[in-house]
Amino acid sequence: MRFKGLDLNLLVALDALMTERNLTAAARQINLSQPAMSAAIARLRSYFRDELFTMRGRELVPTPGAEALAGPVREALLHIQLSIISRDAFDPTLSSRRFRVILSDFMTIVFFRRIVDRIAQEAPAVRFELLPFSDEPGELLRRGEVDFLILPELFMSSAHPKATLFDETLVCVGCRTNKQLLRPLTFEKYNSMGHVTAKFGRALRPNLEEWFLLEHGLKRRIEVVVQGFSLIPPILFDTGRIGTMPLRLARHFEKWMPLRIVEPPLPLPTFTEAVQWPAFHNTDPASIWMRRILLEEASNMGSADRKLPTRRRC
């Protein structure tokens, strides 16, 4: 099929080339022979009057022109897929749909385990690919490379729809043998202790408590940086260090690690975990079904138990 002289099948080839950045892999993805894919590149170059790709070893490196085309082409193909091709009724009991979800280790442990357990009963062939925090999660949504983001709402873009899951609070944690935590934690003591903190993505972006402290001009003595909240408790074991993490996750680790949970010396703001999906998935039956499951399970979470142990005072 042609539109203004362009064979629309070439857009499928271009999308595969941008995704794979390798001629053989892109050809395999769309069931073309390697010579046919080479011919498609030649026709694309002729139509767009741009080299589109240069070779670096076996890697195809896109030109600025190809980069500019990639987003609109991917969006157009996704709209065609969702609006025309995927119009059949969605039956979760028969579906083998794979959902790609970006979320933190905190949300994986305290929330998404519930989703996986429920889906195993209701839709046993549905699969999940859980991905770590990306430096550009909104861009992955726009390109249709992920189905959902589950993140603190303040990190989400306004370009895509979203829904609130539940509120969470931050607490300080340390090893149960840490005698500095037997008394109320003062700000001076908090500042003087060595901290273990979680940062996310390749750029090691600060987490919520660090954003809050930086906004107030406060700086801690960070001794260890880890990729995710769940790595904080093991680093605290048998040390005088302290960490800050979501209360529900601290309660989870408290059950099987010698962890002491204490109130921070200054009130850290509550944050809202939310789910976001691509705008073009709004009417996708599979996405609608999955969103319903997520919201139902979130409503069953209840509130985290904030009652902390009584500590001796000076």
From Swiss-Prot:
Pfam name, any one: HTH_1
List keywords of the entry alphabetically. Activator, DNA-binding, Nodulation, Repressor, Transcription, Transcription regulation
Residue ranges annotated for the HTH lysR-type domain, each copy included: 6-63
What lineage is on file?
Bacteria, Pseudomonadati, Pseudomonadota, Alphaproteobacteria, Hyphomicrobiales
* Further remark: There are at least two nodD genes in B.elkanii.
Name the InterPro entries on file. LysR-type_TF, LysR_subst-bd, NodD_PBP2, Tscrpt_reg_HTH_LysR, WH-like_DNA-bd_sf, WH_DNA-bd_sf
What does this protein's UniProt record list under function? Answer: NodD regulates the expression of the nodABCFE genes which encode other nodulation proteins. NodD is also a negative regulator of its own expression. Binds flavonoids as inducers.
Query: What gene makes this protein?
Result: nodD1
Q: Which protein, by its recorded name, is this?
A: Nodulation protein D 1
Does the record carry DNA-binding as a key word? yes
Top-rank taxon, per record: Bacteria
Q: Which PROSITE patterns match?
A: HTH_LYSR (PS50931)
- Summarize which parts of the chain are annotated to bind DNA, as ranges: 23-42
Query: What protein family does this chain belong to?
Result: Belongs to the LysR transcriptional regulatory family.
Q: Any idea which GO molecular function terms this record carries?
A: DNA binding; DNA-binding transcription factor activity
